[in-house]
Amino acid sequence: MKFRHSFMALALALAVTLPIGAEDLSFDEIYSGYDAEGLTFSDKTTSLEGGTVTISGYMAPPLTPTIHFFVLTEVPMSVCPFCSSDADWPDNIIVVKVDDPITALPYDTPITVTGTLEIGSETDEETGFVSQLRIRADAIDS
């Protein structure tokens, strides 16, 4: 009986923590390695395309204070990642698109993003920023 109560409490805690149908994705699961064309997506990442994912990280300093997208990084970045050379560009990032503009959060505030995973080249019309991997955010929690 005690086991059943513990199991039910654990199940309830997990149900409250993750949105229904959201699959956890971590930065170390996004890529499987490199090939002649650059980074290659992992089988897990490609299998989640079009599905709902949840990933945690940090909002990199954006191009403008009010934004329609931002770069989610695995570790806090105090400088603009767009101002670095290609050699300094981290491979543990993902673009997060939002429907309504949001105000940037402090770079060292941990956040969790839940939304639809998209794969494929897309260029932001306003900034010209090109992404290969995005999350269209349904929720951003800090």
Residue ranges and their predicted role:
Residues 1-8:
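Bacterial N-terminal signal peptides that target proteins for export
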Residues 9-17:
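Bacterial N-terminal signal peptides
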Residues 21-142:
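OB-fold and OB-like single-stranded nucleic-acid-recognition modules
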